Amino acid sequence: MQRYELIRLIGKGGMGEVYLAHDKACSRRVALKRIREDLSGNALLRKRFLREAKIAADLIHPGIVPVYSICSDGEAVYYTMPYIEGFSLKSLLKSVWQKEVLSKELEEKTSVKSFLPIFDKICATVEYIHSKGVLHRDLKPDNILLGLFGEVVIVDWGAAIFKHAKELKLEQDDEAAVSFDERNICYSSMTIPGKIVGTPDYMAPESLLGVEASEKTDIYALGLILYQMLTLAFPYRRKKGRKLSYRDVVLPPIEMSPYREIPPSLSQIAMKAIAINPADRFSSIQELRQALQPYLQGDPEWTVKATLMAKEKSCWKYYDPILLSRYFPVLASSPAQWYNFMLSEVEISASTRVEYTVTKSAVHEGMGILFLPSKEAERGEFYCGYGLWFSVQNHELTVSLIKNGIEIQKKSQEMISQQYRFAILIEKSDNRIAVFVEQALFILHIDYLPSLGNRLGVIIQDLQGMSNIAISESIGALRVSCLAVPDAFLSEKLYDQAAIFYRKIRDSFPGRKESYEAQFRLGVTLLTQIEEQGGDLTQALSSFDYLHGGAGAPLEYLGKALVYQRNGSFVEEIRCLLFALKRYSQHPEIPRLEDHLCFRLYDSLHKHRSEALVFMLLILWIAPEKISVREEKRFLRIIYHKQQATLFCQVDKAPLQFRSSKMELFLSFWTGFSLFLPELFRRAGELRDYQALADIFYVAGVSGNREAFMQFSTALANVSDEITFPESLHNQKVAELMFFVKGVEALRNKDYQKAKKLLWKTPFTLQLYALDIFHIQAFLDEEIESFIDLLQAIYDPASEEERDHILVYIIQTHLWNRDLERAYKLLNDRFPLDEELAEYSEAFILWGCYLALTGDRVAVKAHFSRCRYKYGKSALIGKCVDGDIFDYLDNLVWWEKKMTLFQSYFLLRCLNESPRRYEKYRQAYLSMENNFFD
C-alpha cells in the first residue's frame, strides 16, 4: 500500500471499501478497492475478493472499469482501477423519488427518452459478459455508475461468477465448513457463504428459491432497472423472508406512472423482462436489445385508426369500376380490363401502416394500393403520389413501386406453391415506404422529399379474395421530427405556412442536420409554389444558396438540380449533380443524390428516353449497386437497337455486358458524355486491352472530340515503349494504334496519301474505324473522290466477311454520284425491301435515299411512314422531306441528333432540293457540340 496515498472513502459495500487514492508511481488518481479489515482474515472471502478483481480484469469493454493492478501480499488485499467522476444510477433515481415538481434539467435527465440510451449501454455490457460466460448476479442501480462525460459502467463484481465454473462446487463445499458471524455482515448487499447470492430486491423469484443463477436472472434484474427508469418508482418492496405474490401487486409501468407517457409496447417489454416464469422472459440480452431498438431509433408505435371493409361502400369516398390506366406499370394482364377502385373516406397520417391479407387468385390479375394526395384524388387524378402494384404469375410474386405513374422499383420472388393466402404490411412514414410480405421485407424505398399522399386507394378485381384493411397510425414515438409540422403544411399545399416553420427550424438549429434539412425543404416548397403559380422557376435557386459550404452542402446542388429539371435545363441539371457527387463523394448525404439519380433514370425512361442513357451511365459509374440483375436485362433490351447500330459493337461479336467498361463507353458514345473517357482510357491501358483502346480512339474520333483524341494519342505515344500486349491478342502492337492515330490525323488534315500509307499498316478493324470517322467529313466537305480512293484501298485486300462492313459506304458513294443502277443492285441483293428492314438500320435510310433519287416523293414519304417510332431518328429523317425537323431533335439522344442532321442533309441532296434547304442541316451538324457539355 506504500505506493498509494488514500485520499477519501468514496464507497462501501458488504465485503469491500473503495477509496479515492493517489498513485505515487504514475502520478494519477485511481480508485482503490480493498477488502474490509474486519473480513480480511477470512480465507474464503479473500478468495472471493480476488476472484472479483480477476473477473473484472479479464473483461475488456467500455462498460466495465478496467483493473490496473491486483495485490494480495500479506494482509493487504486490494486492486486499483481508473477513477471515474460521476454518480450512481441509484442516486439519480433517488433524486426524483416522490417529487411532484422537477427542475427542467432534472426532468430532462430522467425522461424516458434520456434513460433508454443509458439502459441500452447497460444491456450491451451485460450482453458482452454473458458472451464471455460470466453472470453478474447483482445488477442494480447502485452498481451502475454514470460518468460526467457520458460513461455508463457496471461496478462491483463481487457476486459475479463464470456460468460453468468448476470452483462453484468447491466454494459450496467450503461454505459448509465455514463459521460466520452474521451480525457483522449486511447480507442484503454482499455474497455470504451459505446464503443466497445478490440483493433480494433485484433477485429473480427462482433465485430466492435457491435455483442456480442463469442469464435470465440477470435479465430479470435488468427488467427491474428498466421499470424504474420508465416509472421513477419501484414495482414492490420485498422484506427479508417474506414471500410475495408478484402477479397481484406489480402494475405495468404504463399504469404505475401514466403521466410519464410511456408507450404501451415499452411497458410490455419491461413486464416481459420481469416475468415470474423464466421461460416467459426474453431468451437473451440480444433479444431484449432488439425489442428496444425501435424506441432508440425513434421508430413509431402503431395503433389501429380505422378498419376498411372492401365490400362496404360506406368506408369509401369513391367506389366505382375503372378501366386500368395505361400509365400504370406494364402488367401481365391487359390494362384494358375493368377493376374496382376504392378511395378511403378516412384520411391517413404522414406515418401510416396498412395491413391486410389477400388470396393468390385475387392478385393473379394484379391489385394496387395507392397513397394519393386528397386534392388530386378528388379531381380523379388517381395516379399521383405513390402506389404499389402486386401480381402473381407462375407462383412468383412481383411488387412494383410507382411514383406519379412511373415504376421506380420492382422486385419478384418465388412463393410456396401451396400457399393460398398471404399477409401484406405496408409502412409509410414521412419519406420512407417499406413493404413486408409474410413479415419479410420485400421493398424499401426512401424519398428525401415529404410524401404528399393522405388518401388510401385500392384497385382490385376480386373483392372476395381481400380481407378487411387495418389502417394504423403511429403514436408514442420517442423521437418525432421537428420537420413534421411544416411537412404537414406542405402536404396540404399550404406553402406560406410551411415556409414560415421551415425558416424557424433552420434558424433554431444552426449547424445541425435539422437546420440544413429545413432549408432544403424550404427551397423545395418555394419551387413547388412558383411552379404552381406559373412563375420563373429560377427564382428558387437562391433559396438553395443558403446551403453553400455548410454541413448540408450537397443538398445545395440537389436542390438546384431539381430547379433545372423542372425548368427543362437538362445539361445544367447534370452539371449540378456531377459537381456534388465529385466534390462531396464521401459526404453522408451523397446517398440521397444517388437515390435521386435512380429516380431520374426511371422517370426519364417514361418521359425522355434521350435523358435516360445519361442517368444510366452516371449510375453505372457512381452507384452500380443500385441496379438489380433484373433491371440490367430490362435496360439491355432498351438499348438493343442502338447496340445493333454501333460500329464497335458490330465488330466485336461478344455480347455487351451491362456492368462493363464497354457499356460505359457505349453510353458515353451515344450521349456525347465524354467526362469518363480519360478514366476508361487509363483503365484499358492498365489492362493492356487492345480492343478497348481502339474503341476509345474511335469514339473520340467519330464524335469530333479532337481534344480527347489528341490527349489519348499523346498518352499512348509516351508509353508506347513500355506496353507489350499479351499473346492472346495476336501480338498486336502499340505501333499499329499509333499508325491508326496518325492516319486519322492525316485524314483530318486532308493529306490522303499519307493517311493511306499509315492505315495500310493497321489491321482491318482500325481501317474500318478510320473509314467511318472520315466518311461524314468527306460527304460534308464534298471530298468524295478522296473517300472513294481510300475506300477502294481498304476494300480490295479485305476478306468477304470484312467487305460486308464496307458495303454501306459503297452504296452511299453510288447514291451521291447518282449511280442508281449500282446502288439498286447492291441494296436489292443485300437488303431487299420485301424483307423486314429494321428502321434503325443504315440500310433502311439508304433505301429512302434511293427512292428520293428516283424523284418519287410519295414513295419516299410512304417508306418513312412505316417507322414504328413517330419521333425516332428514321421517322424524323422522313419528315424533313416536307419541312424542318429541328423542333423535334430534343427527343433524340446526342449521337442520334448528329446522325439525323447528317442523314437528313444526305437525303435532301438525293432529292435534289435547293442548296438553301440542305445547307441548313449541314451547318446544324457542323455547329453542333462535340460533346454533351459544349
UniProtKB/Swiss-Prot annotation:
Q: How is it modified after translation?
A: Autophosphorylated on serine and threonine residues. Present in elementary bodies 40 hours post-infection as 2 bands of approximately 55 to 60 and 45 to 50 kDa, which may be due to differential phosphorylation as well as degradation; an enzymatically active full-length protein can also be detected.
Write down the EC number: 2.7.11.1
Give the residues annotated as active site: D138
- Describe the reaction catalysed, as an equation: L-seryl-[protein] + ATP = O-phospho-L-seryl-[protein] + ADP + H(+); L-threonyl-[protein] + ATP = O-phospho-L-threonyl-[protein] + ADP + H(+)
Give the molecular function GO annotations.
ATP binding; protein serine kinase activity; protein serine/threonine kinase activity
Question: What does the record say about induction?
Answer: Transcribed after 6 hours in infected mouse fibroblast cells, that is from the mid-phase of the developmental cycle.
Instruction: Give the signal peptide, or none.
Output: none
Q: Does the keyword Cytoplasm apply?
A: no
Alphabetically ordered keywords of this record: ATP-binding, Kinase, Nucleotide-binding, Phosphoprotein, Serine/threonine-protein kinase, Transferase
Please report the stretch or stretches of sequence annotated as the Protein kinase domain: 4-296
> Which Pfam families does the UniProt record give?
Pkinase (PF00069)
- Residues annotated for ATP binding in this entry: I10, G11, K12, G13, G14, M15, G16, E17, V18, K33
The protein's matches in CDD domains, at most eight in alphabetical order, are given as:
STKc_PknB_like (cd14014)
Reading the lineage from the top rank, the first entry is Bacteria
Answer yes or no on keyword Phosphoprotein: yes
What sort of enzyme, by top EC class, is this? transferase
What is its biological role? Together with the serine/threonine kinase Pkn1, may play a role in the specific interactions with host proteins during intracellular growth. Autophosphorylates and also phosphorylates Pkn1.
Q: Which family does it belong to?
A: Belongs to the protein kinase superfamily. Ser/Thr protein kinase family.
Entry's HAMAP family? PknD_kinase
- How does this polypeptide assemble, per the annotation? Interacts with Pkn1.
Q: What is this protein called?
A: Serine/threonine-protein kinase PknD
Name the gene: pknD
